[in-house]
Amino acid sequence: MPTAIFLMGPTASGKTDLAIELCQALPCDIISVDSALIYRGMDIGTAKPSAAELALAPHRLIDILDPAVSYSAADFCKDALREMKEIAERGRIPLLVGGTMLYFKALLEGLSPLPSADPVIRAGIEEEAARLGWQALHDELVRIDPVAGARIHPNDPQRLSRALEVYRISGKTLTELTQVQGEGLPYRVLQFAIAPSDRAVLHQRIELRFDKMLQGGFEQEVRALYQRGDLTPDLPSIRCVGYRQMWDYLAGEVEYDEMRYRGIVATRQLAKRQMTWLRGWSDVTWLESGESGNLARVVARAGVA
């Protein structure tokens, strides 16, 4: 069974630097596991690897979609499995790097057999929402699937629409279908998580990075997206941390200082969610951010596999 390496961690933990070092030490090819890096024209706010970093270690599954397009965990699994197969067939090691834990989980455990999106049914749901309001549709979801209804907020039209769509297509609730597991990953997976052990250090790194983004032209980047006219705040791309807060600022809803504050807080909340996922993860080797021995530890594990 071929080997694959997962390098997971919260935002601003040093994943990219370590991944590039690994590519110099091992026959690895990087696959990005990040629901924001997939989008073109979203470079600064996603801390996308620089041209120099990409020259050292090309990343697959970045810059693959326009921000107007949605992308699901199922889409990611299909794309990642294709890339992993191609890398392994060349005798190299797929190195999957990122912080979108849902993608890692879906890849590792296999996806539930959810039906594909149906544009006609989805349009019908949108029409009902326009006529009755999303709260009425949320009430319907609570009746048919109380578990999903408790988890999905009435103000989350994307997930609410998907839950209703799944039921109308299949006759089964989202909760029923997600309890059915798909096929696992046909690789020997070495799993690593990198993060600072001191939460205050991570918070400081997040604040420094957000300010660096602001100084590096983040406002201009989001303004270009804002001025396109075809993007809305409920799209997954614009809901990305930092982008939503800057969007609100450009829309005149918040002042600049408030935007900065909210962006930093939202990024810290994202990091907290990522750490919560990782603490519940089984069979993971923890690495301390910035520690000099990290590369040697990963290389040693890979050599044993």
Curated annotation (Swiss-Prot):
Q: Please name the InterPro entries in this protein's record.
A: Dimethylallyltransferase, IPT, P-loop_NTPase
Tagged with keyword Transmembrane helix: no
Q: What does this protein need as cofactor?
A: Mg(2+)
> Which reaction does this chain catalyze?
adenosine(37) in tRNA + dimethylallyl diphosphate = N(6)-dimethylallyladenosine(37) in tRNA + diphosphate
Residues bound to ATP are 9-16
The Gene Ontology biological process terms listed for this entry are: tRNA modification
Which residues are listed under the site Interaction with substrate tRNA? 100, 122
- The EC number on file is 2.5.1.75
The GO terms describing molecular function are: ATP binding; tRNA dimethylallyltransferase activity
- Region listing for Interaction with substrate tRNA, in residue ranges: 34-37, 158-162, 239-244
**Which Pfam families does the UniProt entry name for this protein?**
IPPT
Sorted alphabetically, the keyword list is: ATP-binding, Magnesium, Nucleotide-binding, Transferase, tRNA processing
Task: List the SUPFAM superfamilies hit by this protein, alphabetically.
Answer: P-loop containing nucleoside triphosphate hydrolases
- Chain sites annotated for binding substrate: 11-16
Q: Which family does it belong to?
A: Belongs to the IPP transferase family.
Subunit composition and interactions: Monomer.
Q: What does this protein do?
A: Catalyzes the transfer of a dimethylallyl group onto the adenine at position 37 in tRNAs that read codons beginning with uridine, leading to the formation of N6-(dimethylallyl)adenosine (i(6)A).
Q: What is this protein called?
A: tRNA dimethylallyltransferase
Species name for this entry? Answer: Aeromonas hydrophila subsp. hydrophila (strain ATCC 7966 / DSM 30187 / BCRC 13018 / CCUG 14551 / JCM 1027 / KCTC 2358 / NCIMB 9240 / NCTC 8049)
> Which lineage do the record's taxonomy fields give for this organism?
Bacteria, Pseudomonadati, Pseudomonadota, Gammaproteobacteria, Aeromonadales
